[in-house]
Amino acid sequence: MSAAPGGKFKLSGLETTADDHDAVEQATAYIDDIIQRIRDISNNLMPGTLVRKGVLYAIEEYIDGLSKNEALKISFVHQGVPELDKAKAINIYRLVMEIIHNTLKHAKAGFLDIEFKREQDMLILTTQDNGSGFDYETMKLNNSGLGLRSMLNRAEVMEGDMYVESSPGKGTKYIIEIPIT
């Protein structure tokens, strides 16, 4: 076995059957798929666009990529948002990703409107979907919903507040207020 370019290994000199060859091909395809998934996850956690061009462009790029593959119509408008420090930009990006992910996975919504604006010394991120909604108070009492807890923690880390308006059958609205400091 010797390393080939790209980090793959050649099984030269070994006697193999057709079944062995098929198994190696399947394993190679599986490993290639895992590598691609890791790259995708890594890119979603910290996309190069976020570092190079900022949070607004990174969100727009993510939404553009989704619109080609998902039935969900996403609208993103922003107004007066200043350049943000890296930590705040990452947290806001991940908040938006979690909201989009939850909308796709749970809400069965047709649209998701995202608005991000500056009001005096606050950044206001507001999202609204027309999905199935959920009982927010019950989820809070039961301490369920890992994504929701993650979102609350991110808002708290930025010394912000997150408000949720949702009920079964009525869609979900998130309002996240973050001080500009």
Show which residues each predicted segment covers.
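Conserved short strand/loop->alpha-helix "switch" segment adjacent to the catalytic nucleotide/phosphoryl-transfer site
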Residues: M1, K73-M97
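Short alpha-helical "switch" segments that flank and position catalytic residues
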Residues: M1-D20, H101-R118
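Short beta-to-alpha transition helix within the HATPase_c
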Residues: E25-D32, Q36, T49-E70
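Conserved transmitter core of two-component histidine kinases
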Residues: L66, L72-Q79, L84, I124, ...
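Conserved polar catalytic motif of the HATPase_c/GHKL fold
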Residues: R94-N102, H106, S150
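A short beta-strand-to-loop micro-motif at the C-terminal edge of the catalytic HATPase_c
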Residues: K117, E165-G171, E177-P179
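Acidic ATP/Mg2+-coordinating residue in the GHKL
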Residues: D129
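ATP phosphate-binding glycine-rich loop and adjacent ATP-lid/helix-beta elements
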Residues: T138-K170
